[in-house]
Amino acid sequence: MASLKKSLFLVLFLGLVSLSICEKEKRENEGNENEEEEENHEEGSEEKRGLLDLAKHVIGIASKLGKRSEEKRGLLDFAKHVIGIASKLGK
C-alpha cells in the first residue's frame, strides 16, 4: 500500500511539473507574439507618419503654385492618393 501511494504521488508530482513547464512555454510564446505585433504596429505607424508628412508637403507646394491650376490639381490628387494609402495602413 505504501509503494502504491509513493507511485501515485510521484506520477502526480511529475504531471504537475510538466504542466507548469508547458504553461511557462505558452506564456513565453504569447509574449513573443505580442512583441511582434507591437513591432509591426510601430512600423505601420512610422510609414503612415511619413506618408502624411509627404502629403502635407505636396499640399504646401500646391498652395504655392497659385494660378497653375492643372499642376495644382495634379498635386492635390496625388496628396489625396497618399492620404488614402496612409489611412489604409492605419487599419
Curated annotation (Swiss-Prot):
One of its GO terms (cellular component) is extracellular region. InterPro entries: Frog_antimicrobial_propeptide. Residues 31-41 have a biased composition (Acidic residues). Keywords: Amidation, Amphibian defense peptide, Antibiotic, Antimicrobial, Secreted, Signal. One of its GO terms (biological process) is defense response to Gram-positive bacterium. Residues 1-22 form the signal peptide. Transmembrane segments: none annotated. The keyword Oxidoreductase does not apply. Residues 23-49, 69-73 form a propeptide. The modification Leucine amide is found at residues 65, 89. It is found in: Secreted. Expressed by the skin glands. This is Preprofallaxidin-2. The lineage of its organism: Eukaryota, Metazoa, Chordata, Craniata, Vertebrata.
